């Protein structure tokens, strides 16, 4: 009996629609699907914005794992093209993950890294910063944007017919203006978000606290490390979630060094 894939496809197009009013160029796609409509292999090479994007989801025969690899040289354009996130500009994206050997092939565990990018017109982040009464950073978000040097996170992605869930753990990002941690879940099927974390406004409040003779030494343990921070939560509809901020958190210097990849 034939037990091969139900569909094998190889496509090359000059322009490919990826989301509403979004395109990538010079796309080459190779795909294999099973008889239930599941994807056994998907390879894509294309141009998104100013750079190439590569996508690989395929079996690794020696380990019996499904392997996911995504690379984008213009991360912002790639994220916009596939309807993931609209507010990133530039940057380099790397995502690597794999399933358990002999385990559930629909669950991928891995890490994501985004470097040298800018965030502009991000309403949720603007709400968090606005709650901390930092108008300078809010103004940056709505104009030139805020530069971040690095973002990284662990993730577990479960993708089935009725489930499309991404669990995020140990997320952190930092730049000259702020650092953030984040963890939680994105339900792509229900289009909801449930994320909590810590936000550290570096350039303003922390420099002020560090310069206070007595309070500054107490809060920074005399090291000059900034420890003023706020905890936050973002929950509800991904398009218009509810945000909550507690601006009275104090962090140990070691935790701050972790946020800023030191």
Segments from the language model and where they lie:
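Small-residue helix/turn framework positions
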Residues: 3-23, 28-235
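Gram-negative outer-membrane assembly/targeting C-terminal domains
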Residues: 239-262
């Amino acid at each position: 009996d034939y037990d091969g894939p139900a569909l094998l496809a190889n496509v090359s197009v000059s322009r490919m629609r990826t989301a509403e009013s979004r395109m990538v160029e010079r796309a080459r796609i190779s795909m294999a699907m099973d008889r239930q409509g599941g994807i056994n292999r998907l390879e894509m090479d294309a141009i998104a914005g100013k750079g190439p994007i590569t996508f690989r989801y395929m079996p690794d025969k020696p380990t019996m794992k499904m392997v996911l690899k995504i690379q984008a040289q213009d991360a912002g354009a790639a994220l916009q093209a596939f309807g993931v996130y609209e507010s990133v500009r530039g940057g380099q994206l790397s995502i690597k993950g794999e399933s358990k050997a002999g385990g559930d092939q629909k669950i991928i565990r891995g890490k994501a890294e985004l470097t040298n990018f800018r965030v502009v017109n991000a309403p949720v982040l603007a709400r968090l910063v606005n709650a901390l009464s930092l108008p300078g950073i809010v103004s940056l978000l709505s104009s030139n944007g805020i530069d971040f040097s690095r973002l990284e996170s662990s993730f577990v992605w479960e993708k089935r017919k009725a489930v499309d869930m991404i669990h995020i753990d140990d997320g952190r990002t930092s730049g000259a203006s702020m650092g953030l941690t984040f963890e939680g879940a994105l339900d792509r099927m229900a289009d909801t978000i449930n994320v909590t974390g810590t936000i550290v406004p570096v350039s303003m409040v922390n420099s002020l606290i560090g310069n206070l003779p007595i309070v500054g030494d107490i809060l920074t343990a005399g090291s000059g490390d900034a420890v003023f921070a706020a905890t936050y939560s973002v929950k509800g509809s991904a398009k218009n979630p509810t945000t909550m901020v507690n601006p009275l958190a104090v962090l140990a210097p070691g935790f701050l060094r972790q946020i800023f990849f030191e």
